[in-house]
């Protein structure tokens, strides 16, 4: 059986179990492009799998383990059905990376990102800078996952009763995310700009479109973000294995929300469940991790204030 045919059959199988299976499917299709769709599944060897796992840079990243898991499950499925004779993955796995510490953007860095989104392109790109800037703003101001942001449709957006419907996101949940007057005005302005660029688009169309009127590709958006971050001069030097990410905008939103509640004197423990619902977490414990990060942030802010008061910092 050809690799492409086998992979598509496996994806159909996973989805028949009730899974959305989006990320895994995307990784497996990347593997198909890597080895060639017409390659016989029986001919796949350890060397070609290792090259895919390590990527062009030959480094171990978080993606290494995600790719490994996706391939392992598919290969096991294929061996049972006789499509492959063995699992051609390397026997030794690299040491598991430490849990990724989220990067919390400062207000200054957020402004730099939003500004850079309008100026990072050296040549005309298929993604309008206005679109890229709004993707970053919506992801941060609403605390969304980037996949949720790019999946928003026009008919998901309600500007009269300010909210957006996030449909069947992670954990197959649909939720309503409200927003304030300032965000409503921001989205109203963008909707008017979008209508001028793509007249006659149906309400079922994606909110964010490229110059050809096509929905945004997630990988393209992530690639653009890396260039925007570099143009903004934002990097981390704390030994982390990757630079600030798009997803860190969501982490920043959560930490800033909790920090604001602390400063307002609110009982944060009572509010954590509502934040968990807002973020679309399946368990409150997934949201509670931000409490530790917020405590550290407030302690650091307190240190800086004391140093400033004592004339140690200018």
Residue ranges and their predicted role:
Residues 1-314:
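Conserved catalytic core of the tyrosine transesterase superfamily
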